[in-house]
Every structure is written in structure tokens, then in C-alpha cells.
Amino acid sequence: MKLLRRAWRRRAALGLGTLALCGAALLYLARCAAEPGDPRAMSGRSPPPPAPARAAAFLAVLVASAPRAAERRSVIRSTWLARRGAPGDVWARFAVGTAGLGAEERRALEREQARHGDLLLLPALRDAYENLTAKVLAMLAWLDEHVAFEFVLKADDDSFARLDALLAELRAREPARRRRLYWGFFSGRGRVKPGGRWREAAWQLCDYYLPYALGGGYVLSADLVHYLRLSRDYLRAWHSEDVSLGAWLAPVDVQREHDPRFDTEYRSRGCSNQYLVTHKQSLEDMLEKHATLAREGRLCKREVQLRLSYVYDWSAPPSQCCQRREGIP
């Protein structure tokens, strides 16, 4: 009799254990059946909202601007940025550092942003010349993270750009010539500045700057911008942003294209109807060029050359690259 009771107790315990094991298995299968995004798999929480869609354009335009340069930005909006082609052709922002600004300056920028929505505000950056290299790198890194684009034009807020001509030239390129593009007006014989505003005390590479496209305006392909963002923590920043960019891209397999139609030196060479970008423009210059384009389909009311230009000789040493001659725009 005792043996029967023991056998019964063992059978009951075994049955209860089997039921518990089956229940656990069913619970596990039910949890696995819920999709990762299903609220049942998230302890009753609602699923996270979808990530916002990235802006997209063929050509991005980043204009480095100062907090108090609202009038310049207004003129650019109404002149060369107004000629941006079809939807999806051009995406543009004015980049402004806001660290250290007073309350009134911040409010003015907030009002401008509310009205136009085209400011790229950089709260971690104090807008000053000595921070220009960090600013340009921050602009490019932000662009790579937030916008789908093929090319970017970096310009200053005293530059005038022919977006229609730039778009046409870039679209006409063969696929192989759209990769690793660094396009502008190059210098290879720039002597290292020992003093003044452009002093580069930390430059130790050689007695000349490495070949670089002058900063009044240049074009980069998206793959180079992506490379710069991924490398940003390892890049040495010098005072001049264009000199820094030339050094950063020096060891990279890029297509450096010197183009005299980029009038982007520290002083304008004049006015040519061939120019794609013209630096050192007053507000009156911009308004006149825009009006002449609208009225006559050409950039200049009257073509004039104030300084000679050059074609970069890539076969010569950098110090002998750039001989100015007649007949070059």
C-alpha cells in the first residue's frame, strides 16, 4: 500500500512538472511571435516614431556667414540663391556659430530662422575668424549626417555664385568624374604667413602651403565630405580653412581640378561672363550681377580684368605651379 502511495506521488509530481515546462515553453513562443516593433514586445510602450526623412538635393550650398550679417544673407537670398533651378536641384543653408552671443543677437537669429528656415545654427561654436576652420568642418560634418547630396558648394557670404552654370557642369560629368572631386581655384605656392591675421605658427609641414582651393568658393563631392566627417577627430586645424582642407586632402586620392572661372582669391580679378564664383563682392555688386543676368543673360555689365590669372601646372613643382598670363579669365 505504501509503495502505491509513493508511486502515485511521483506520478503527480512528474505531471505537474511537465505542465509547468509546457507553460513556460508556450510563454516563450508567444513572446518570440511578437515583432520587435510590436507594442506587445515593448511592455505596453508605443513604438518609437520613425526617423525624419533626410533632405535631398543634387547640389548642397553652405554659406559661411557671421551672426550680424543679416543684410548680406538677405541680398544673397534675393539674388544668386534665388536662381536654384527645379525642386531637388539645390539645398542651401547659411552657417552661423551662436556660442557666446548676447540675448538680442540670439533673438534676431531666431526671428530670421522663423521667417526663412535656412540658417544652420552651430551652438557649440563661437563665430570668429580663429574658429573658421572648426566652423567649416562642423558645417560639412552636419551636412553629411543630415542631407543626401552629390556635391556641395562652400562659399563665403561675400561671394556670388552662378548656380545654374554649376548645376549644368556637374550634371554633364561622367560618373567617374563625379567621385572624389575637389574643384576650385588652386594655389600651390602660398608662402606660410609668419604674422598678421593669417599667421600659421603651428604649420610645420614645409615652407609652402600644400596645394589648396581658395576659400571664396569651392566644390566637393559627397564622398570626400563623408571622409572628412569620419576623420574629423584626427584632423589638425590651422587658422585658414582653405589651407587646412588642402592639407587634409593631400594624402587622399582625389581629383583636384583647378578652374580659372572660380574668382575666389583674396581680391577679385574683375568680372568675366565665364566666372562661376566671384569673391569679395559688395551688396551692390551682387545686386548688379543679378540684374544683369536677369535682363541680359550674362554676368557682367562690362567685362573687366583687374589682375592676371593662371592655369595650374600640375607637372611642375608646387612653387612653380602658377604663372599669371594674359588671356586667362
Curated annotation (Swiss-Prot):
Key word Transferase present: yes
Variant or mutagenesis effect after changing C206W: In ALGAZ; normal Golgi apparatus subcellular localization; proteoglycans maturation altered
Gene Ontology BP annotations: chondroitin sulfate proteoglycan biosynthetic process; dermatan sulfate proteoglycan biosynthetic process; glycosaminoglycan biosynthetic process; glycosaminoglycan metabolic process; heparan sulfate proteoglycan biosynthetic process; protein O-linked glycosylation; proteoglycan biosynthetic process
Record's subcellular location: Golgi apparatus, Golgi stack membrane
Catalytic activity entry: 3-O-(beta-D-galactosyl-(1->4)-beta-D-xylosyl)-L-seryl-[protein] + UDP-alpha-D-galactose = 3-O-(beta-D-galactosyl-(1->3)-beta-D-galactosyl-(1->4)-beta-D-xylosyl)-L-seryl-[protein] + UDP + H(+)
Outcome of substituting D207H: In SEMDJL1; normal Golgi apparatus subcellular localization
Cytoplasmic-side segments: 1-11
Documented effect of changing R256W: In SEMDJL1; decreased localization to the Golgi apparatus
Glycosylation sites: N131
Cofactor(s) named in the record: Mn(2+)
Residue intervals on the Lumenal side: 35-329
Record note on what altering E265D does: In ALGAZ; uncertain significance; normal Golgi apparatus subcellular localization
Pathology noted in the entry: Ehlers-Danlos syndrome, spondylodysplastic type, 2: A form of Ehlers-Danlos syndrome, a group of connective tissue disorders characterized by skin hyperextensibility, articular hypermobility, and tissue fragility. EDSSPD2 is an autosomal recessive form characterized by an aged appearance, developmental delay, short stature, craniofacial disproportion, generalized osteopenia, defective wound healing, hypermobile joints, hypotonic muscles, and loose but elastic skin. Spondyloepimetaphyseal dysplasia with joint laxity, 1, with or without fractures: A bone disease characterized by vertebral abnormalities and ligamentous laxity that result in spinal misalignment and progressive severe kyphoscoliosis, thoracic asymmetry, and respiratory compromise resulting in early death. Additional skeletal features include elbow deformities with radial head dislocation, dislocated hips, clubfeet, and tapered fingers with spatulate distal phalanges. Many affected children have an oval face, flat midface, prominent eyes with blue sclerae, and a long philtrum.
Protein name per its UniProtKB record: Beta-1,3-galactosyltransferase 6
